[in-house]
């Protein structure tokens, strides 16, 4: 039968071929869907009916965190939908997500084989990789071991705290005393995101590479400016991820995405190569050195099951650098917006710092127990902004079930963190910004049980490996900023806090005024 159609191939146009191929794929998927056998005692996932070829893309829209939240109200905490030709599922509700990612962690620990993911760190990314479970776990363990050996997370007075504090103090001082003050004197306003993102990137560079860049260094600026388009593609998905035939058609978006990743890789590869040249096992200078050290040890270990290649080192460092500065800088940028929107909260934070830390020294991580309102403010920023609306998509590693519903192997699973953080069954008046919800009744202590309900870094086996550094970095930078600066809007310009969807949701860029606290 196949041989009979070969003579006609040369007379068929490209468009006709694509239509034919799409039709075949569509028929196959429809037949596959209706032939899916549901094990006895389980139910088929509920969800909206998909359109041919595009699935439920139109219903998901450009604000999927809102549309999928609306669908969860209709279909429940576990439902299916289709993005193009890819069967997908969405998990909402704190109990459901915790059950999936913790109790059934192995079954939901995979990553979908999305076309765009193959180009992130040349396919060597620890966060986006589809490596088999054993390989991925071994590499994650090595990465965490390298991070721990550099940061000594297990000690009561962590070495990473000292390093993080050192870099944060230097960058915080440069941020408020040099950059912001100089900019304010010249222009009368400043773009908070522009300066925060470079300062944070320098802290991450110090941790990963042991070096600092000037705030006008063009190489660093060009790289940090790539985080937005990267997040937009990963967050919204590339059409080729969900309609496979599009992989073979030219795409400006995909070309730009590949260029972004190539530039990131080139930057990190250069630094890793330099570290190999100057590496001294008796002088581990930073996270890159620590990863090289673990890599060398495993090369010498004949019994090691998984060898970590040089490319994997680049991928891990790239993950830590990219995710670290983007997460912290986005959180801090939102923090400044909330400080401006709620001046009475800004004043409470300043008074807490003034009374418990003073104004003559830089805040330290050991001050955290004495700054419960600042801790509550950070948690409420994480919850209210939900600037990480979804985790990186998960994938089922085998046929499984959840809440009585059958979920087939290789289902792309979205974890709706935004829904959890705005669930009225979990939070009183979730739309209001209220840091006091995380304090004890007398307002003197942080309510840690309430804080644990906030979903921001994922859960379980795929939980963000850099969570500790991210939380500590946000705390240190924000404490320094509140201690030294007071923010205001420009006269006649309203504050626009409308989020723009992406892997991390940003607010619209704006200009603000700032005054030094010491000069007030």
Swiss-Prot record:
Q: Spell out the SUPFAM superfamilies in the cross-references.
A: Cytochrome P450
One Pfam family named in its UniProt record = p450
The coding gene here is cyp1a1
Q: Which residues form a coiled coil?
A: none
Please give the name of this protein: Cytochrome P450 1A1
What positions does the entry give for heme binding?
Answer: 464
Summarizing the function annotation, the protein's role is: Cytochromes P450 are a group of heme-thiolate monooxygenases. In liver microsomes, this enzyme is involved in an NADPH-dependent electron transport pathway. It oxidizes a variety of structurally unrelated compounds, including steroids, fatty acids, and xenobiotics.
Single Gene Ontology BP annotation: progesterone metabolic process
* Similarity-based family: Belongs to the cytochrome P450 family.
Catalyzed reactions per annotation: an organic molecule + reduced [NADPH--hemoprotein reductase] + O2 = an alcohol + oxidized [NADPH--hemoprotein reductase] + H2O + H(+)
Query: Which InterPro entries does its entry note?
Result: Cyt_P450, Cyt_P450_CS, Cyt_P450_E_grp-I, Cyt_P450_E_grp-I_CYP1, Cyt_P450_sf
How this chain sits in the membrane, per its record, is: Peripheral membrane protein
Q: Which CDD domains does the record associate with it?
A: CYP1A
């Amino acid at each position: 039968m196949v041989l009979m159609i070969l003579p006609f191939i040369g007379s068929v146009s490209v468009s006709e071929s694509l239509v034919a191929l799409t039709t075949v794929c569509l028929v196959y998927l429809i037949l596959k869907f209706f032939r899916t056998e549901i094990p006895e005692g389980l139910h088929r996932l509920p969800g909206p009916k998909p359109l041919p070829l595009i699935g439920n893309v139109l219903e998901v829209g450009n604000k999927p965190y809102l549309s999928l939240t609306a669908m969860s109200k209709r279909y429940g905490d576990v439902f299916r939908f289709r993005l193009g030709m890819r069967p997908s599922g969405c998990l909402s509700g704190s109990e459901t997500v915790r059950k999936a990612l913790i109790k059934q962690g192995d079954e939901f620990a995979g990553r979908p084989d999305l076309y765009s993911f193959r180009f992130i760190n040349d396919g060597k990314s620890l966060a986006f990789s589809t490596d088999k479970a054993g390989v991925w776990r071994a590499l994650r363990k090595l990465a965490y071991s390298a991070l721990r050996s550099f940061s000594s997370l297990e000690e009561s007075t962590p070495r990473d705290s000292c390093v993080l504090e050192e870099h944060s103090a230097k960058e915080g001082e440069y941020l408020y005393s040099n950059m912001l003050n100089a900019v304010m004197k010249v222009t009368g306003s400043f773009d908070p995101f522009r300066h925060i993102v470079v300062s944070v990137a320098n802290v991450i560079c110090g941790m990963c590479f042991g070096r600092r860049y000037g705030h006008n260094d063009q190489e660093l600026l060009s790289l940090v400016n790539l985080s937005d388009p990267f997040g937009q593609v990963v967050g919204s998905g590339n059409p080729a991820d969900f309609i496979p035939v599009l992989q073979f058609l030219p795409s400006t978006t995909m070309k730009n995405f590949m260029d972004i990743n190539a530039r990131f890789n080139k930057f990190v590869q250069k630094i890793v190569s330099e570290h190999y040249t100057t590496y001294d096992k008796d002088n581990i200078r930073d996270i890159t050195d620590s990863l090289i050290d673990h890599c060398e040890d495993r090369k010498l270990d004949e019994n090691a099951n998984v060898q970590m290649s040089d490319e994997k080192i680049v991928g891990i460092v790239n993950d830590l650098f990219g995710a670290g500065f983007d997460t912290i800088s986005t959180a801090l940028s939102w923090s400044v917006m909330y400080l401006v929107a709620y001046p009475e909260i800004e004043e409470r934070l300043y008074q807490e710092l003034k009374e418990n830390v003073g104004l003559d020294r830089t805040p330290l991580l050991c001050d955290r127990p004495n700054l419960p309102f600042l801790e509550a403010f950070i948690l409420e920023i994480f919850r209210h902004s939900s600037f990480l609306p979804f985790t990186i998509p998960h994938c089922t590693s085998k046929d499984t079930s959840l809440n009585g519903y059958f979920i087939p192997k290789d289902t792309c699973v979205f974890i709706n963190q935004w829904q959890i953080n705005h669930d009225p069954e979990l939070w009183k008046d979730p739309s209001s910004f209220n840091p006091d919800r995380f304090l004890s009744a007398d307002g003197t202590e942080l309510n840690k049980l309430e804080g644990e309900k906030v979903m921001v870094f994922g859960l379980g086996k795929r939980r963000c490996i850099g969570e500790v550094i991210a939380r500590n970095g946000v705390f240190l930078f924000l404490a320094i900023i509140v201690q030294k600066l007071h923010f205001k809007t420009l006269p006649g310009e309203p504050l626009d806090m409308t989020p723009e969807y992406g892997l991390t949701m940003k607010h619209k860029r704006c200009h603000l005024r700032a005054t030094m606290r010491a000069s007030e």
